[in-house]
């Protein structure tokens, strides 16, 4: 049995006096039995290195201890962890290496009674060969020098290894969790997020995304929220073919803090760079982190020019508050593991701590938008835009594009912002996903949407949103095999399933007439947060599409109820607005008016107000519809969808109500470049697509322009991937029949009427438009 040496150690809030056998925390003695204490000394002596079970047995237990060794070791480890306040499942100090041994995670400061005698690894050559070997190893060991100051003794540290091998602009990097030996939980997760913000300012460096890290952890058999220790991060690095792992550390030395950063090649373990900085106070830690991040960027190959251009200090780029940054970083982690909705309270907390935290507002707005709460999204993105000067360049791109998407609605400006963003940060997936998901579809540029969606997936194969936006563009183009293949790529080996995936499966099944597939998708959504109400609304639309309005109303109410139970009032209002619209299209005017007004009392978001105004106009309430149209024009003067889709369609219906079909046709001219687009109202509530086309067709009918009317309704039938289950897709058959009847072509008219009546063969018999259709068809016989 070999007794550990007599040096003293300091780590975090703890001190160890080997000679007296004392463990102190902030000067107070902690009781620890002899065996756990000697175990601690061995681990400290080998900090950063795996100490095998065999070595522990040889050094602490009797050589002939075999039977009781395992249980004795477990007891000693447990008692030691209890003394340090450590946990096996989420270790700060002692990491269990299955079937091998243990490792002390925190770099330990080894001290002696003489300030002239320096730390382990810098002693005279007479030191044991084992120490020299440890010095040459790749372990994360800090050498601490004793330095005398007038005001007292302060400790500074440096890394043992030196070397510089540059990264290329094609390399990716994995960021490990910081080792926090201070005992202060405010640094847990916070410094990693802060470093990520600093490094993501670089157009040169590219960090592996959190989505890809989580996916890789699953393939490793680890939980998605597993701690990224140096060893785990190295395996993630190897599995993702990344170039390097960045390991960080923060330690307290008296009242000061020491930060370190080291980059290793994950394949060879070669050290690329090592940086260190000291912070005199807790409040200076973020500034110190900014310093080492900037140094690291230049030393691994980034040009000084780009570092100087894109290098906003962390306190200015995010927040000077560690507590706010802690809430923000935790929110991002929660969003990854449990969804955007679960992260909302933490993001709100971050903005409460720092009311000028621009990116916290931006993420809060994005999270609200993802759950269909556009009003709250707009409010928070507006605040982010107000404080955008307190953000890095990359974050400002995000905030500016989000502002144009969610506040002004000016998609031309959003497109320009995303294009410059993608040029400046060519490996950032977000501008491509914005273009593919929210800009090109509204313009009707679905092929461009596919192109940008593919880029998104290529840049990050584990980014679920990338597959989602690509799938939507394939559906718009009715490339259903490509859409299904994209979903399969996401859900197969990568296991990337989000609520959108179920909705997309339902839409594909609907377009194929696959009732069993629709039922499977709907069943998978039952009880799923964020999916059940959405799919219930899809089911309501499908029922309305075939004329089963009574069943559709029941399903629509269920969708709204589920949304309200989840505190999503705006989503509930959207579903109610959609129901009012299909009632209005079918001529059930009193009910449509009631439901529309009720929806507007719940929420007055842009899309709800448009849908309500449209339903009221169809139902003959021109006065109230005009009031809402004026309000839309006042509130959204720059909004692309409002200016070139919503208002032209509304004004055209109002003109028809006044018996002015020619004026209606003229008013709709401005909508022509955008009319085949998927408007924002169709993203969550599935209404509004091709409404300008439908209204123009009605105007052509009213103007007795039969051929032109038929051409408009044929556009709707030719673009089922855009309309999907909106009831105008079924009603277009009827309107086409009316156009052919007006032209005198009874044969084509009969065919069109038959197509409509086949879709509505089991429809509710008392629907006004259904009764009209049957009478009109009878006259053609």
Question: Predicted regions: what is each one?
Answer:
Residues 67, 318-321, 354-356, 390-395, ...:
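Inter-repeat boundary and helix-capping residues of tandem alpha-helical solenoids
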Residues 331, 365, 401, 436-437, ...:
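Structural signal of TPR/SEL1 helical repeats
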Residues 2-10, 31, 43-48, 64-126:
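DNA-binding patch around the recognition helix
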Residues 534-726, 731-759, 769-780:
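Helix-coil-helix junctions within alpha-helical repeat/solenoid scaffolds
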Residues 505-508, 515, 520-530, 539-545, ...:
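Beta-propeller blade termini and top-face loops
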Residues 335, 369, 405-406, 440-441, ...:
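Position-specific recognition of the canonical hydrophobic site in helix A of tetratricopeptide repeat
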Residues 36-39, 80:
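The N-cap/first-turn positions of alpha helices
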Residues 7, 17, 22-24, 28-31, ...:
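Acidic, proline/glycine-rich low-complexity intrinsically disordered segments
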